From Swiss-Prot:
Domain Integrase catalytic residue range list: 105-268
Keywords: Transposable element
Domain of life: Bacteria
Protein's name according to its UniProt entry: Insertion element IS600 uncharacterized 31 kDa protein
Pfam families recorded: HTH_21, rve, rve_2
GO molecular function, one term: nucleic acid binding
Disulfide pattern: none
GO term, biological process aspect, one: DNA integration
InterPro entries: HTH-like_dom, Integrase_cat-core, RNaseH-like_sf, RNaseH_sf, Transpos_IS3, Transposase_IS3/IS150/IS904
UniProt keyword annotation of Amino-acid biosynthesis present: no
SUPFAM superfamilies assigned: Ribonuclease H-like
Length: 272
C-alpha cells in the first residue's frame, strides 16, 4: 500500500498513530458543552446568549469560535412563526386613550404592565390564556387560563397580579381594545386599584409590542412543538414554560443577558 501511494512505511505509521491536535481536542470538548447548553436552553439561544450561558457555567469561549462550532454542529434556534390576533375590538364599550404611544421606557418594576389574550389549540378544544407582563423586568407577572375568552378570565389574571405585586397607584395598565379589557367589571378593578388605563389604537399590534413579543416567544419556543390531546396537557406545558423557564432561566438581551427574575432581584438589591 505504501508503494502504491508513494509514501514511506515510517511515514504511514506516523500518520496512523498521529493524535489530534490540542486545538482539535479542545473543540471536541467544547462541542459537547455547547450541545448540552443548547438542549438546556431549549434550543432558543443564538451565539450571544449561548456564550453568556456557557460563561456562567465556567466555559469561556470567544464568539467567533462559538459561532463556528455551532455551525459545525448544525445547531439552530427554533424558527419564528406569525400568529393571528385574538381579541375583538368591534364593540360599543368605552375605550381608554393610548398613554404609551409605543414608548415602553419604565425605570422600575410595576410602572407599566401590558396585558393580552391568546389561544392554544388542543384536541379537546381551544384553551385561552390571559397574561400580564411587567415591561421593565420582562416578567410575566400573572396569567390565567380557561375554556372561554371572557372578562372573567382577564379579570382573574389582573386580580392575581395585583394581589401578588401590590403596585403603587399610577401604574399604567396597557392592553388592546378587546371587549374583555373594556368591560365595566374590568375597568372597576383598575380604578379601585389606582391604575391608569391605556389602550392600543384599533388594529395596531405594535402598540402592545412587549406582550405580542411574549406570545410569539411562547409559541415559537414551546407550544408550536406540541400536539395537545387536551387542555390539561397544554396548561401543564404553559405553566412550566412561564414559571420555570421564561421567568427564572431564559436570558433576555435587553436585560443584560439575565433572566427577568434575576433582573428584578438585581434592581431591588441596588435600590436597597
Amino acid at each position: 500500500m505504501c508503494q502504491v501511494f508513494g509514501v514511506s512505511r515510517s511515514g504511514y505509521y506516523n500518520w496512523v498513530q498521529h493524535e489530534p491536535s490540542d486545538r482539535k481536542q479542545s473543540d471536541e470538548r467544547l462541542k459537547l458543552e455547547i450541545k448540552v447548553a443548547h438542549i438546556r436552553t431549549r434550543e432558543t439561544y443564538g451565539t450571544r446568549r449561548l456564550q453568556t450561558e456557557l460563561a456562567e457555567n465556567g466555559i469561556i469561549v470567544g464568539r467567533d469560535r462559538l459561532a463556528r462550532l455551532r455551525k459545525e454542529l448544525r445547531l439552530r434556534c427554533k424558527q419564528k412563526r406569525k400568529f393571528r390576533a385574538t381579541t375583538n375590538s368591534n364593540h360599543n364599550l368605552p375605550v381608554a386613550p393610548n398613554l404609551l404611544n409605543q414608548t415602553f421606557a419604565p425605570t422600575a418594576p410595576n410602572q407599566v404592565w401590558v396585558a393580552d389574550l391568546t389561544y392554544v389549540a388542543t384536541q379537546e378544544g381551544w384553551l385561552y390564556l390571559a397574561g400580564i407582563k411587567d415591561v421593565y423586568t420582562c416578567e410575566i407577572v400573572r396569567y390565567a387560563m380557561g375554556e372561554r375568552m371572557t372578562k372573567e378570565l382577564t379579570g382573574k389574571a389582573l386580580f392575581m397580579a395585583l394581589r401578588s405585586q401590590r403596585p403603587p397607584a399610577g401604574l399604567i395598565h396597557h392592553s388592546d381594545r378587546g371587549s374583555q379589557y373594556c368591560a365595566y367589571d374590568y375597568r372597576v378593578i383598575q380604578e379601585q386599584s389606582g391604575l391608569k388605563t391605556s389602550m392600543s389604537r384599533k388594529g395596531n399590534c405594535y402598540d402592545n409590542a412587549p406582550m405580542e413579543s411574549f406570545w410569539g416567544t411562547l409559541k415559537n419556543e414551546s407550544l408550536s412543538h406540541y400536539r395537545f390531546n387536551n387542555r390539561d396537557e397544554a396548561i401543564s406545558v404553559i405553566r412550566e414554560y412561564i414559571e420555570i423557564f421564561y421567568n427564572r432561566q431564559r436570558r433576555h438581551s435587553r436585560l443584560g443577558n439575565i433572566s427577568p427574575a434575576a433582573f428584578r432581584e438585581k434592581y431591588h438589591q441596588m435600590a436597597a
